[in-house]
């Protein structure tokens, strides 16, 4: 095992896949000369050249469309959005083309494209850089949505996403790029649509994904001191959702808590849902 930052795991996954398959290329704002806004493509321009690591104009609709169109000629593009907030500029290409090409062509065309970048809140980047979009894309038929919580999952799931023949939304966090974790030395791929039990427990099931998994660990540590055993499930993939893993855990614990990123500091009491 070796220790990598989250951004390094992302870079390693893309680089390994691009060495394996020449039809894969990376495009987006500042991905080449600047090594990516969050340095997730560091060194890739030097290794693969400007034909496969492509700096784009600030025109998300345009380069999202180029990526989707290029899948129809046998390419497998990776598109980096500087933030998924900017994906809204190109959302017509994602929703009305990428997600529907296979069906609209009667199966004649696949659309193996990965749209990746940070989502949700970040450090002092204001409202237009801070919205979470996983639920938006997860409600669109034809898309797969992955939100990893650590470097190990990020690398294994990104490699799977790149090899997938359908469009994948791969969401990261600006607050996690420096997080470190152990990653195997050799190649590995994690299956899309399979949740992971990060911590076994017996009293309550805690379900979350992405950066909020770290908060789940903190809560579980506090509850453990009170004699309450938490089972933490990391969804990893929001669509397709691994509901079976969650149900099996709830059958054991009979209690379920779902953690999401909301404005807890402005609430008199925590959010609850009865029934």
Language-model segments: residues:
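Thiamine diphosphate
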Residues: 1-167, 171
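Conserved small/polar residues in nucleotide/adenosyl-binding loops
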Residues: 265-271
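Generic long, charged, amphipathic alpha-helical segments
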Residues: 231-249
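Glycine-rich phosphate-binding loop
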Residues: 253-263
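Glycine-/acidic-rich phosphate or pyrophosphate-binding loops and their flanking alpha/beta elements
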Residues: 9-13, 155-167, 178-222, 226, ...
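Conserved beta-strand elements of the Class I
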Residues: 25, 205-207, 257
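Short helix-loop-beta junction
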Residues: 44-50, 215-233
């Amino acid at each position: 095992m070796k220790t990598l930052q989250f951004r390094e795991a992302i870079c390693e996954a893309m680089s390994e896949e691009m060495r394996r398959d020449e039809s894969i290329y990376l495009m987006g704002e500042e991905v080449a000369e600047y090594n990516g806004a969050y340095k997730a493509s560091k060194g890739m321009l030097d290794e693969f050249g400007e034909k496969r690591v492509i700096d784009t104009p600030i025109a998300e609709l345009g380069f999202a469309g180029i990526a989707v169109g290029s899948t129809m000629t046998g390419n497998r593009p990776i598109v980096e959005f500087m933030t998924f907030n900017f994906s809204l500029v190109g959302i017509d290409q994602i929703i009305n083309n990428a997600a529907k090409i296979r069906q609209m062509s009667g199966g004649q065309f696949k659309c193996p494209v990965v749209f990746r970048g940070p989502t949700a809140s970040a450090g002092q980047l204001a409202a237009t850089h801070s919205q979470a979009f996983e639920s938006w894309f997860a409600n669109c038929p034809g898309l797969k949505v992955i939100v990893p919580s650590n470097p190990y999952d990020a690398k294994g799931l990104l490699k799977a996403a790149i090899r997938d023949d359908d469009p994948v939304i791969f969401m990261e966090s600006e607050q996690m790029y420096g997080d470190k974790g152990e990653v195997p030395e050799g190649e590995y791929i994690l299956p899309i649509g399979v949740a992971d039990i990060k911590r076994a427990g017996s009293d309550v099931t805690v379900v979350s994904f992405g950066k909020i998994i770290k908060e789940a660990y903190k809560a579980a540590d506090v509850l453990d001191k009170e004699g309450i055993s938490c089972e933490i499930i990391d969804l990893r993939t929001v669509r397709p959702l691994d509901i079976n893993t969650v149900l099996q855990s709830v059958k054991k614990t009979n209690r379920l808590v779902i953690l999401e990123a909301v404005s807890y500091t402005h609430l008199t009491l925590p959010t609850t849902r009865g029934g």
